């Protein structure tokens, strides 16, 4: 018997459209003010040792405010993520920087990096395998490794394309015989359409994830937004689940979100569905009500 650390090595968030900075450092400083974003995800609820994930990011702009919309500006992000699954606990700490290069008509090309550390903890004291494995018997490990993420994005007021490369530093974990940290790529794209003369907008989005030696994972989203205050979305994760999400602005500077993943694969027999909640806090001043200004989903 051998262990591969985290068949799902990196968390995929159902509410990624609202929390891109958790994946891609090129989104650091995207908003014109400081923001805090947090997510808690309980995956496959009802299954023993099912994954649970928590993430927190603080992001903002560096330096003096841009003089105009054709000025280069810089962003920063500080991020912490914690994943727990059975005997494993995975902590990631990152500090990020992004540069945003403007073009005419409010087109931006951005590049960002995260530098940080991965901490993998393994404790099999509560693990009861069917067959004894000497490589993990009475094992407790704590492993620290450097981590690097690179991201880029291109956006206008109506669409965006973003690409992030994660687990850039390939390493072997000292847990079992086949425990490796593998390279991941994450691509997302979306657009925004105003629905007539109303205050509603419609934003389709796609997210594509690929890790070495694994099938491509696809998420499709359809998100409706009213006056930057109310968001409703439907999604589909290929061969895995249907997604339903809602997000509301409360008390001016807070946005609270919830998503539910209705599992379609073999886990459905155990009704092992997934719940995710999010909270974001923005220091931005209130803008004039109306359609959202960018499909990056601030």
Regions found by a protein language model. Name each.
Residues 3-7:
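Sec/Tat signal peptide C-region and signal peptidase I cleavage site
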């Amino acid at each position: 018997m051998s262990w591969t650390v985290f068949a799902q090595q990196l968390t995929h968030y159902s509410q990624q459209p609202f929390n891109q900075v958790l994946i891609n450092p090129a989104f650091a400083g995207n908003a014109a003010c400081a923001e805090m974003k947090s997510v808690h995800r309980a995956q496959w609820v009802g299954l023993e040792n099912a994954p649970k994930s928590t993430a927190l990011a603080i992001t903002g702009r560096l330096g003096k405010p841009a003089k105009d919309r054709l000025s280069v500006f810089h962003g920063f992000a500080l991020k912490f993520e914690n994943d727990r699954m059975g005997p494993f606990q995975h902590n990631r700490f990152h500090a990020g920087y992004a540069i945003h290069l403007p073009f005419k008509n409010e087109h931006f090309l951005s590049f960002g990096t995260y530098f940080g550390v991965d901490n993998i903890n393994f404790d099999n004291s509560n693990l009861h395998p069917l067959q004894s494995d000497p490589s993990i018997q009475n094992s407790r490990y704590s492993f620290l490794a450097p981590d690097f993420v690179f991201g880029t994005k291109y956006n206008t007021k109506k669409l965006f394309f973003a690409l992030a490369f994660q687990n850039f530093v390939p390493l072997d974990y000292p847990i079992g015989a086949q425990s490796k940290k593998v390279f991941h790529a994450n691509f997302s794209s979306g657009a925004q359409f105003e629905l007539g003369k109303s205050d509603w907008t419609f934003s389709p989005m796609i997210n594509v994830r690929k890790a070495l030696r694994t099938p491509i994972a696809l998420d499709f989203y359809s998100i409706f937004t009213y006056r930057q205050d109310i968001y409703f979305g439907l999604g589909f994760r290929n061969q895995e689940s249907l997604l339903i999400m809602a997000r509301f602005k409360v008390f001016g500077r807070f946005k609270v979100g919830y998503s539910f993943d209705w599992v379609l694969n073999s886990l459905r027999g155990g009704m092992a569905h997934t719940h995710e909640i999010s909270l974001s806090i923005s220091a931005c001043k209130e803008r004039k009500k109306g359609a959202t200004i960018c499909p990056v989903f601030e």
